[in-house]
Amino acid sequence: MILTDLEKLVTDYTNKDHSSQGFNFKSSEFDYEWEVSKLNWYFYLDREDASLFVADFQTVRDYAYFRIEFPLYLYHESEFCSEDSEIFKDVDLEFSFRNGWLKITTIITEETDLHHIFDVLFSVLKDYN
């Protein structure tokens, strides 16, 4: 998996000022209908040993749902669950591992610190990169 490409995509996007478009990652102010609707990301990292990543944002009433999925072949799945599940829980990231795919989800509200969530996500996943 090419985690640095995913991290760069998210970092580049969140560092830009989108307030004129109705969404500001830095202050976490949402105009759900405008910005989140065009923030559906489906992308493929094309390399022999690369993984397929699927990530998207979906608007659900007064919050947004973030999901990212990718193949992750762990030799010690139990270590991931025991060591990292608490870290994810602290920032309300939920995960499941099924058929070689890791799925991570969270709910984003106006109070959500997106930078912190992504920092935690990437710091944990780098251990498996």
Where are these regions (language model features)?
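UBC/E2-like fold recognition across ubiquitin and ubiquitin-like conjugation systems
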Residues: 1-35
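Ampiphathic alpha-helical segments that act as solvent-exposed interaction surfaces
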Residues: 5-17, 74-129
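Amphipathic, interaction-prone secondary-structure segments
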Residues: 22-83
